Amino acid sequence: ATPESVRGQFDGQPVTYWGVTIRPYRSDGGYFFDYIDPQTDRRLETREIVRTVGSRRYQQYLSRTDDGAYHRLEMLWHIEDQRWVHMNGVFLGHDDNPFDSNAAVWNTGCIMCHNTGPVPGVSNWEQISQGIISGETPMGGAGPAFEYESSVVELGIACGSCHGPGSVHAKRNRNPFRRYLLHFTGDPDPT
């Protein structure tokens, strides 16, 4: 998350939804969410924003934990309306969903559809699979937790996210005459 990529208003003004108060702010060049107890005004937790997702309609914010997992946080910035919105108001679900019902691990969920060339990169898969074989349960059970070394070819939804690598298409369409010919004849581009 950089000043060039962050679109949200991190001005320290608290935002309260579903009985939870979050204070988005900047400090020492970084971006943070403080989770505040609305009854006592005491800070419960601080999450550093390390990655952004989205730049057109709304922007989501991710923090990272020691195991390499990126976590999608509960509040997003609505770019057109210039306001904070809770994730429960954006994703379909019951009105009584818990505050954190749309918080997610980006490495295993969001990465697959919202990026080009995703590799979730569970770095300790052998350990996890051996634990499962012996009856252990990962993620909060008796077994080891997932550790991530995720990568993508390109962050965000690009042509290749749905259509696959586009090198042949790009190479053939460098020639503007070919593009005009296809446009004016109405012929489909086979690449």
Regions found by a protein language model. Name each.
Residues 2-12:
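Active-site-surrounding "flap" and adjacent substrate/cofactor-binding loops of secreted or lumenal enzymes
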Residues 21-191:
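Extended surface/linker regions that mediate inter-domain or inter-protein docking
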Residues 16-18:
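A conserved amphipathic helix/loop scaffold
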